[in-house]
Amino acid sequence: MKVKIELSGGLELLFDKKKVHEIEFSDKNEIPLKDLILYMRDNLLKERSELFVVDDTVRPGILVLINDADWELFGGISYNVEDKDTIIFISTLHGG
């Protein structure tokens, strides 16, 4: 199973300044979005995890899109990510 992760709005700075990550899970057909977020925290995130994850979900102020649609349309954190899905994380938190 391959999943494409896109980061913007400054989140890419926490992930080694990479906007796009391709992840492959060879032993799975689907993975809960919550598990994907925790995988990202544990394996891809390079600094300041509190700016991405709070209480095992994305921090408030981060917009999550699944294949270009709001994740709430798919059940939010309980969505099962499938092969070839694109998950986009956009930070709406900015300094002023």
From Swiss-Prot:
It comes from Dictyostelium discoideum (Social amoeba). C-terminal thiocarboxylation occurs in 2 steps, it is first acyl-adenylated (-COAMP) via the hesA/moeB/thiF part of the MOCS3 homolog, then thiocarboxylated (-COSH) via the rhodanese domain of the MOCS3 homolog. The keyword Cytoplasm applies. Pathway: tRNA modification; 5-methoxycarbonylmethyl-2-thiouridine-tRNA biosynthesis. There is a cross-link at residue 96 (Glycyl lysine isopeptide (Gly-Lys) (interchain with K-? in acceptor proteins)). This is Ubiquitin-related modifier 1 homolog. The modification 1-thioglycine is found at residue 96. Belongs to the URM1 family. GO terms for biological process: protein urmylation; tRNA thio-modification; tRNA wobble uridine modification. It is found in: Cytoplasm. Keywords: Cytoplasm, Isopeptide bond, tRNA processing, Ubl conjugation pathway. GO terms for molecular function: protein tag activity. InterPro entries: Beta-grasp_dom_sf, Mopterin_synth/thiamin_S_b, Urm1. Acts as a sulfur carrier required for 2-thiolation of mcm(5)S(2)U at tRNA wobble positions of cytosolic tRNA(Lys), tRNA(Glu) and tRNA(Gln). Serves as sulfur donor in tRNA 2-thiolation reaction by being thiocarboxylated (-COSH) at its C-terminus by the MOCS3 homolog. The sulfur is then transferred to tRNA to form 2-thiolation of mcm(5)S(2)U. Also acts as a ubiquitin-like protein (UBL) that is covalently conjugated via an isopeptide bond to lysine residues of target proteins. GO terms for cellular component: cytosol; nucleus. It comes from the Eukaryota. Its main location: cytoplasm.
